[in-house]
Amino acid sequence: MSTESERIESVSEANASSLEVGNDQMSEALAGQAQELKTIGDDKEGCGNFASAGDNGMEKVNGFTNLVKETESVNGELDLGTRTENVGGESNQSDKKVLVDSEEVMMVEKRGLLVEKEVEPDMVCSHGADLSDVKVSDGRLDSEDLVQDRKPDGLEKQGTKVEDLDVVCFMGLEPHESKDESILDDEIAHVAAKVKISDSDLVWAKVRSHPWWPGQVFDASAATDKAKKHFKKGSFLVTYFGDCTFAWNEASRIKPFRQHFSQMAKQSSLPDFIDAIDFALEEVSRRIEFGLACSCISEEVYQKIKTQNVINPGIREDSSSIHGGDKVSSAVFFEPANLVGYVKRLACSPSYDATDALQLVSQRAQLLAFNRWKGYTDLPEFMTLQGSVESAPKISPAEEQSSLVEVSDPEPTKSKQVYTKRRKTNLQTEQSSLVEVSDPDKGDCKHDGVFEYEETIVPKKKEKTLAEFIAEKRVSRHNGNTSHEKSGNVPHCEKKRKVVQSKVPKSTKKIKANLQTEDPGSPVSPKNDRKNNLSAGDKITPQKARKSFGIGASILKVANQMHCSTPTRLLPCSDSTSKKAAKSNGSGKSLQEKPKAEALSAREISPSTTLSSPHAASVTKTTSGKSNSVSLDHNLSGELDQVRKEAPSTNLVEDPMLESRDLKDSSKEQVVHEDKKEAANVADEKSIMDSNLTGEKISGLDLREQPSNKNCSGGSDSCKEDVSAE
């Protein structure tokens, strides 16, 4: 400590001696130096304007005057006059030291710096005047160098060094003051000056014991009475998203929403905080859509994005609707190139972080506005699969087929034909009634096994009347084959029925055998047919649809045949016919007592006779004609009974509706024929009693049967052909 004090005293003594010796010389040197500075023109950038020297020395330079003021603010213990004298002395000393070599100047600078390093804070406090002298001397040396080198930047360096020294003195003299607090206040004031907050801005606001929360700024005039009770001067009314709260926040606790989104979004993972961010992002999207909307969009969409409705207890209802957007969301800030680039990058890597949600929402809103301008109401939506394809559940083919909906075009239906599918059960039994159908793909061939499905045609309605059918059957029985007219009327896709050619039966057994061979197959019910078609392993064979006619049709056939047997006109009688009629008259009673089978065989006529004379079986005009006609009626009635017995065993009925209808017809016909049978019996008794009646009565009986023949000829084509042949 003693050495340091001695050094300080030696320095002060040297300064005092220098002041006493060279006042006059220093004044002269300073005057010459001032003149040189004026001639060069560095008055503005130099150390300042110089004045004429007085008795105590030259006036202070402007830079040194400022130094004195700063020293006064830091060191309150020093007097202004004392420091002024010191500064003046230093200025004189600086003028004197101008003529010294540069080595001496460097030595003085080192001494000054050494003193500054070695002096402790308490020493500085006790020797404030001496420390100021040292600091000023250091500044003096710098000024001398600057004056010698003619550099205008020297004063700025001088001021910087002095400020550094002042800071050191500040820290040493008043250690209880905190520099950090002063800097923090300056930063807050600086941030508040930079942030420009306006109404309806989206911001981040801070409340004690809560993270930075997204909110929206409102004007103080929009506050409710409840909110005005918490009003603070110089604060802003902020409504928070999500929880519908509000607060009066100072400018230092408010930050812009967009600039600080990536930083603030990481604060918390609470559901309330995430919901608040989502609501804020929805408002961002609405503002961008409104800012880029054109007049071509629909009114409904425009009203949806035009207004923001705020529900908050701190905002009045009349101020809760905000129309429009903000300046940042307008079309001026829209950059199409950035949008296209972002979409391409997102397509390459679809994943994004939560901190990029603001950018994603903004770009999506811009793309949506562009799509609306193109005429679409919304963006296209695509279904995305999460996870790998290998981890996806496998769907069985059955489930996949059940999920699909099969749609088939309806086939055009025909008005008079219905397509059915039949199955061939036994080829051998059906061979007599079916004709093999050629396969268009495999050529004409006979199939040994089972057929595939084939569509056959079943007429909905009867295409022929019963009278026509009876006439055809009658001709086929005489000719031994089917008529060609029937085969010509069959449709192209329907199979022809194969009829077995045989001789004319001579007995009822042959007739029965003919009926069995004509249709040997058993009827197939629709229910069994449907079950067989639905069976998995069966192959289906085609079968021709048979004509539907029942028992009533058979009975009616015989009745019409009986009426059609009488000719429309009477043939001339010959001798042979009259003899046969006389014989038959005598044996009328015996014929009546014959069995029915013999009566039918007696009635049958040879084929040659039938073809030559179709009406040979009719009754001729003889004197004993009445008994002959009565025997013919007995024969017909016997044939009717025989057919009625054999009819239930036939396999001709396929349609239940037609069967019921034919049964009704058969019951009616049966009653009619029973009446005719009783009438025939009465006629037989009369014929036995009145066998001597004249031929006029017989002719009268023939004339009574003639109208029925006319009716038969009107309903049957075969009868007309017979009349034309005669």
UniProtKB/Swiss-Prot annotation:
Q: Which GO terms describe its cellular component?
A: ESC/E(Z) complex
Q: Which residues form the signal peptide?
A: none
Subunit text: Interacts with DEK3. Binds to MSI4/FVE and MSI5. Component of the PRC2 (polycomb repressive complex 2) complex which regulates histone methylation on histone H3K27.
Q: Which residue intervals make up region (Disordered)?
A: 1-26, 392-441, 472-545, 568-726
Upper classification of the source organism reads:
Eukaryota, Viridiplantae, Streptophyta, Embryophyta, Tracheophyta
What gene name is listed for this protein?
PDP2
Q: What is this protein called?
A: PWWP domain-containing protein 2
**Per the annotation, which location comes first and is thus the protein's main one?**
nucleus
Where are the compositionally biased (Basic residues) regions? 494-512
- What species does this protein belong to? Arabidopsis thaliana (Mouse-ear cress)
Q: State the function annotated in the UniProt record.
A: Together with PDP1, PDP3 and PDP6, interacts with MSI4/FVE and MSI5 to suppress FLC, MAF4 and MAF5 expression by regulating the function of the PRC2 complex and modulating H3K27me3 level, thereby promoting flowering.
The alphabetized list of GO BP terms reads: epigenetic regulation of gene expression; flower development; regulation of DNA-templated transcription; regulation of photoperiodism, flowering
InterPro entries per record = PWWP_dom, PWWP_domain_containing_PDP
